[in-house]
């Protein structure tokens, strides 16, 4: 609900899971921005694939790096999951664990919030297909009122991505501006051209300042 770049019913994602014979679930994954980014990470738990929520991950693992300096656990969970029907049927009789997180609730800081997450189904199912995506194309979370991961940064990411769609399609755009293409006009940049741009500008294509 807080990801402005999410691809609804992504055909590549659906097709990837459908083409696997033994996998019954899949989840999109991005490289973490840094060790402090508040996203869960993909890891094996008791030899089964799963997600460790950021609030449950010990700091020593959060900061752990490889010899080249990259994060050891950098597969970030962006909460875009997909299940085959047989997987959902298996979960009908299962119960998911509770997680705790400190949040600001009704103006009260450091309140405890108890949550259940769908990703805890992965160890129960036993198989999960990680599907890597590019952050700039698919992950623009809105978690803060301002600063990083805010409405402003999400707006800018949409504008830059759609501007790139138009540029690749040959549209005569203003590179100093940002653009938003209606999903009724193009799902992921297909079907665009300079002719379409000129016809739809101000209608299904909006131009705005950074």
Regions of interest found by a model, annotated:
Residues 5-178, 182:
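Catalytic core of tubulin tyrosine ligase-like
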Residues 167-210:
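Domain-scale signature associated with acetyltransferase and cell-envelope carbohydrate enzymes
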Residues 1:
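Short acidic donor-binding/metal-coordinating loop in glycosyltransferase active sites
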